């Protein structure tokens, strides 16, 4: 099978049967788990068509996977999994943002980032927009909090390029699309026309379809296409929407975009009981509220446990209460004020349990949204170890929402599902709830089965749909016939047969006559590590992970550990060892431990913490002792590193490279850094100027600048002012005195030891550094300013466990960028601005919230400041980019293309090693932003 698939692809390595690749790709965000036989990565639509023809000939099924954020099991398989994310990320904005052409691997957030500059966005607004991709948005007919059924995928998709299982490619935007379809697929063309006639001629079918699709509904195929469109090509395109990869492959889609609101006002409205909240919905919907989110009493109780919960919830004695999170949005302040006043007037007439007001303050609004979005994380993160989270999604007519939620709560009580919060999009009658259980226990699986039967009866009895926006998948496929009836279910079966007569696309998904299908292949999540056990495999971490296109993502690092543990529990030691053999490079060596995964994770997992511990466990006593010795003599060690770069620059490059490669082969690529000629010379010792006045801060120049000298635009030669000289010059120019510790050469934040798992040396160096900083800061009175963002973060982490001595203040660590933006910039001469600047925020500056200050400094330097749309962590990660340059090359590839297209006057960041990584990736010299500020404020310069 693997050979037959390889034969139709153009590059080696596009088909993998390796155990690590198969198990890493097995899990998506759903509660199902199937391990594919192979993972295939095609490069374009033509290869996908060839794959489908080859799979049909072999009788092998295919399942497409892009973002892997689907929740109903529609993107898992035990056959061939086709990755249509990696090579399908193109985005083309059309008509100044009125339309956009997108391929399936681009995320909604990436598309909206490009549309934002035109004041537009996509209509579908799924909560998973940071990670979900256009492929899934189309395949699931995604909607979201705001779009309802008027701006969802079905309503806003203008055209698509669809690859059928036969290999036929149909661009529905082509004037002769129907002619092409009729010529190449005559049976399909006639069959679609006949099915449209069949449904239209049956008044009962028409009534059922119209009722079903008058609300959010992703159960089964979108039969409304048979009523809404007249030509087979358009019918086919709109049947493909929501078809979950069972009819063909959507290689490209063109969307009509919608206006992007720029002003919002938000309030949390609390009611005495659920029915009162339900009764308020019509008035709120009529008032043109953009969002109305429901939180039931259990949600409010769980929300009270969240950090930062607003007083309106925190101080509430919850009984039968419910709340609606209401938001108005507009494109102008005047429009918003009109909506806000109408909303304020409504609050006095809809029976609130306590007064409420709408706020436009960004921080206050963020607190309210944190409550809503934190509920899922709170319940999922607190679930018992070894249990699986299952998120359900239903819709009923809005008038039935209150009694449906009440009945659901009674079902939770009957089946003893505790903390099962009900929340969702109230104005659409669409709610979500989560169950957590150990479904490997037969009794608990039976409980879930019984609960599901009662839930299905409840929802269908209220005239609702069993899936509003998450797709049918495997979880509701056995119930499609019950929701639609035999006649329309038969129509769906014929649609599948017409498009995919060989049944090669995603069998078992969307239509399944096995009444137990939803109870099979439920994911087991054995406990593997405290740092990551609460992971729900949502995939939100993947777009921000720098190793995502090279080896593994954080989700894949975790699910592979679970696969190893499951194999051992099942007695399959051979599989466990096979996975472990490949795990070290893929999961440990090529992890940047940048913590960006935590910024995207709804349960705040930093997979880097796990990797650091694994590195620590792998480190032998000799290595620990060696790194501890370096910590004890760090002043000498850091200077020697810089001198080594000076020496390398003087020697013939070929000789240096040859010797370096030989040592790497002997000692290992994860031990000896790779030398390359574009590296700068050494940076020299950290200076300590004599103080001339009363210092306002302690200045901690990072040791990385002692190892790596500054960039010299155009030449790479020494002599430019590095970041330490620049900070001191800026402070002097602003009339601000800084104190540099007397023993600065021996001090370090400890990050190199922490990231490598060298805990003994880390303890040695951080103890010395904290003692020196406490001494020179007058026991915490003065702030400490560091000039490299990763080192700033390292110092903050080191201080997390420090207990200040009695009577002393905690040490305050500031980054030089934020210190400059607040204290120096207002006192400096007006900078001479350059035309343009491309800025690279770092993972550390992002995690610490420093990017607004970074942008402020950059905007003082340049007329035009741009951050590439595909910005991300460069993965240089201290020395990781020297040990594994392939990691940085992969992480920066798309960003580098955009940097080169921008071709700015200058390029800047706020961390020396990140500057090295971006210089290597782009060919442009990157400097610290404060070096550029220094140059632009030199008198007469």
Task: Please place each PLM-identified region on the residue numbering.
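Non-heme iron-sulfur electron-transfer modules
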Residues: 511, 516-517, 548-583, 604-629, ...
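N-terminal flexible segment immediately upstream of the FAD-binding catalytic core
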Residues: 1-57, 67-98, 127, 175, ...
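C-terminal substrate-binding/cap subdomain adjacent to the FAD-binding core in PCMH-type
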Residues: 137-139, 147-150, 157-371, 523
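Terminal amphipathic helices with adjacent charged low-complexity linkers/tails
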Residues: 253, 288-385, 420, 424-425, ...
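Iron-sulfur cluster-binding cysteine motifs and their immediate structural context
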Residues: 503-510, 540-564, 590-617, 794, ...
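Iron-sulfur cluster-binding electron-transfer modules in prokaryotic oxidoreductases
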Residues: 500, 608-941
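Ferredoxin-like iron-sulfur electron-transfer modules
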Residues: 482, 517-537, 569-593
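N-terminal glycine-rich flavin-associated loop
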Residues: 30-62, 84-126, 138, 142-194, ...
């Amino acid at each position: 099978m693997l050979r037959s698939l390889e034969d139709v692809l153009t590059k080696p390595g596009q088909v993998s049967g390796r155990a690590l690749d198969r198990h890493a790709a097995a899990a998506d965000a759903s509660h199902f788990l199937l391990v594919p036989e192979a993972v295939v990565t095609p490069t374009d639509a033509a290869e996908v068509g060839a794959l489908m023809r080859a799979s049909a000939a072999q009788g092998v099924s295919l399942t497409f996977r892009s973002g892997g954020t689907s929740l109903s099991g529609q993107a898992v398989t035990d056959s061939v999994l086709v990755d249509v994310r990696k090579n399908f990320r193109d985005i083309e904005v059309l008509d100044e943002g009125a339309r956009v052409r997108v391929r399936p691997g681009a995320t909604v957030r990436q598309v909206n980032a490009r549309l934002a500059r035109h004041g537009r966005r996509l209509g579908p607004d799924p909560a998973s927009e940071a990670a979900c991709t256009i492929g899934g948005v189309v395949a699931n007919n995604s909607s979201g909090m705001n779009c309802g059924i008027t701006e969802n995928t079905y309503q806003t998709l203008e055209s698509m390029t669809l690859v059928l299982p036969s290999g036929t490619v149909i661009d529905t935007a082509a004037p002769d699309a129907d002619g092409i379809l009729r010529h190449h697929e005559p049976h399909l063309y006639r069959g679609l026309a006949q099915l449209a006639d069949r449904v239209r001629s049956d008044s009962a079918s028409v009534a059922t379809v119209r009722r079903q699709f008058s609300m959010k509904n992703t159960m089964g195929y979108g039969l409304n296409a048979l009523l809404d469109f007249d030509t087979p090509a358009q019918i086919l395109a709109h049947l493909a929407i929501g078809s979950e990869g069972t009819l063909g492959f959507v290689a490209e889609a063109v969307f009509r975009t919608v206006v992007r609101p720029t002003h919002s006002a938000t309030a949390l409205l609390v009611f005495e009981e659920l029915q009162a909240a339900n009764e308020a919905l019509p008035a709120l919907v009529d008032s043109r509220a953009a969002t109305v989110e429901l939180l039931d009493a259990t949600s409010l109780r769980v929300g009270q446990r969240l950090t930062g919960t607003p007083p309106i919830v925190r101080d509430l004695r919850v009984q039968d209460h419910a709340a609606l999170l209401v938001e108005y949005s507009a494109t102008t302040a005047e429009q918003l004020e009109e909506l806000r006043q109408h909303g304020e007037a409504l609050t006095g007439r809809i029976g609130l349990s306590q007064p409420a007001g709408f706020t436009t303050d960004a921080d206050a609004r963020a607190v309210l949204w944190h409550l809503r979005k934190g509920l899922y994380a709170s319940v999922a993160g607190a679930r018992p170890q070894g249990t699986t989270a299952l998120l359900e999604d239903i819709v009923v007519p809005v008038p039935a929402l209150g009694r449906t939620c009440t009945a659901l709560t009674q079902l939770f009580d009957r089946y003893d599902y505790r903390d099962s919060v009900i929340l969702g999009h109230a104005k659409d009658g669409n709610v979500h709830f989560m169950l957590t259980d150990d479904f490997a226990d037969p009794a608990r699986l039976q409980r879930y089965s019984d609960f599901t039967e009662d839930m299905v009866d409840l929802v269908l009895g209220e005239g609702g749909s069993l899936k509003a926006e998450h797709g049918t998948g495997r979880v509701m496929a056995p119930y499609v016939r019950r929701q639609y009836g035999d006649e329309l279910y038969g129509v769906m079966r014929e649609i599948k047969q017409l498009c995919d007569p060989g049944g090669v696309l995603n069998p078992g998904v969307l239509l399944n006559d096995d009444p137990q299908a939803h109870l099979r292949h439920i994911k087991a999540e054995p406990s593997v590590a405290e740092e990551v056990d609460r992971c729900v495999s949502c995939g939100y971490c993947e777009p921000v992970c720098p190793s995502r296109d090279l080896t593994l993502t954080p989700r894949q690092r975790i699910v592979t550990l679970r696969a190893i543990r499951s194999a051992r529990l099942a007695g399959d030691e051979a599989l466990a060892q096979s996975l472990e053999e490949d795990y070290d490079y893929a999961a440990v060596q090529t992890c940047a431990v940048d913590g960006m995964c935590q910024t995207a994770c709804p349960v705040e997992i930093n997979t880097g913490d796990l990797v650091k511990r694994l590195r620590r466990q792998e480190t032998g006593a000799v290595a620990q002792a060696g790194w501890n010795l370096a910590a004890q003599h760090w002043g000498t060690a850091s200077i020697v590193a810089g001198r080594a770069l000076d020496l390398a620059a003087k020697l013939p490059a070929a000789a240096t490279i040859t010797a370096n490669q030989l040592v790497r082969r002997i000692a290992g690529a994860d031990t000896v850094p790779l030398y390359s000629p574009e590296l700068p010379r050494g940076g020299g010792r950290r200076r300590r100027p004599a103080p001339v006045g009363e210092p306002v801060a302690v200045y901690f120049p990072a040791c990385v600048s002692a190892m790596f000298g500054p960039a010299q635009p155009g030449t790479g030669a020494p002599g430019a002012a590095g970041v330490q000289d620049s900070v001191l010059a800026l402070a002097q120019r602003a009339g601000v005195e800084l104190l540099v510790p007397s023993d600065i050469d021996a001090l370090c934040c400890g990050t190199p030891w922490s990231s490598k798992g060298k805990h003994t040396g880390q303890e040695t160096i951080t103890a010395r550094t904290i003692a020196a900083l406490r001494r020179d800061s007058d026991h915490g009175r003065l702030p400490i300013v560091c000039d490299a963002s990763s080192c700033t973060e390292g110092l903050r982490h080191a201080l997390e466990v420090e207990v200040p001595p009695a009577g002393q203040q905690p040490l305050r660590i500031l980054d030089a960028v934020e210190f400059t933006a607040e204290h120096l910039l207002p006192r400096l001469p007006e900078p001479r601005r350059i035309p343009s600047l491309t800025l690279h925020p770092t993972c550390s500056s992002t995690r610490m919230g420093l990017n607004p200050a970074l942008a402020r400094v950059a905007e003082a330097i340049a007329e035009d400041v741009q951050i590439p749309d595909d910005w991300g962590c460069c993965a240089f990660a201290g020395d990781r980019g020297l040990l594994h340059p392939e990691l940085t090359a992969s992480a920066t590839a798309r960003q580098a293309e955009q940097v080169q297209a921008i071709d700015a006057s200058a390029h800047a960041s706020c961390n020396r090693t990140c500057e090295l990584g971006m210089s290597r990736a782009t060919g442009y010299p990157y400097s610290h932003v404060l070096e550029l500020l220094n140059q632009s404020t030199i008198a007469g310069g």
